[in-house]
Amino acid sequence: MSLHEEILQYSRQDTMKPLSNWFSNLLSESIESGVYGDKNLLEETGQRLVAGIRDYGEKYNINRVAIGMSGGVDSALTAAMFKDAGWSVLGVTMPIHQNPEETDRGIAACETLGIEHKQVDLTKTYDQLLKTFQDHDSTLKDDDQKLRRGNLRVRLRMMTIYNEASRIRGLVASTDNFSELAAGFWTLHGDVGDLAPIQSLSKSWEVPRLAEMFGVPKETVFAKPTDGLGISDGDEAQFGFSYLEFDLVLLRLCQAGVLSTREDCLNFLNVPESDSDHVNKILDRIRMSTFKRTNPYNLTHPIQTNRYTGLNIIDSALW
């Protein structure tokens, strides 16, 4: 199987609408330039990230981590990397009106990877919390408020996982990948954490391929990506484009260097008219999530403008 075909398989693009000619050519160019690396490059990438986890633990004298095991490939790969780095890993499943298959995959990943598992069923807690909020805001139950209700689930899970991390005197792992970071497909003060080993990895190729290499079960590697919140029929249905399409545009733009306007982005990509609407939808997604990546936006002291720089210097000196 060629690398091109492998990427279509691991991104699940081969189960969806075929790539347009422009996207297919962009994939070929991305393979040729090394943006989509082969197995050897991925092995090196994975081992360097594991070394980074190990170095972090040695620097800050910590080696325990709690990870929310959603049943998806991101959390499973994150757990596998921490385990490979020699950390004590607690995988926590936290179902809330969950598809049982997702919870089962989270448990199976813990068993396969040989890490400790704990289940905290938050369904009743969430229902009570939702009722309390609805008593003060009846609109929360409306059909068009799924996103708000979903964010409540995520933040309830984050409270739980941080409590578990505190109990074991460890930290919380962030399981977001680079694609989700750029798309804003995460909740502020929700599904984030203290150390993010896979946040530089693409969802369409590096995450699933590395997950298989690290021993994650195949049913998890190839599971349909969902937010686990019941907001839509999978991540890509919510986006309106596939992860592979998103990553191809994102990673190509990351190579551009200086970009000043949207027009610069489109010109650099050399997007044909037939694909312009699709690419603009991707650019809109990145643009509308910028506020998440800059949160909180810290205003500079109007007189003593170097305070943040000074604090960074102090932090570096003390560590």
Language-model segments: what does each one mean?
Residues 72:
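Conserved G/P- and acidic residue-centered "switch" motifs that form tight phosphate/ATP-binding loops
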Residues 76-83, 162:
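Short, hydrophobic alpha-helix immediately C-terminal to the catalytic nucleophile
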Residues 75, 79, 100-107:
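Short, surface-exposed alpha-helical segments at coil->helix boundaries
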Residues 84-89:
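Conserved S-adenosyl-L-methionine
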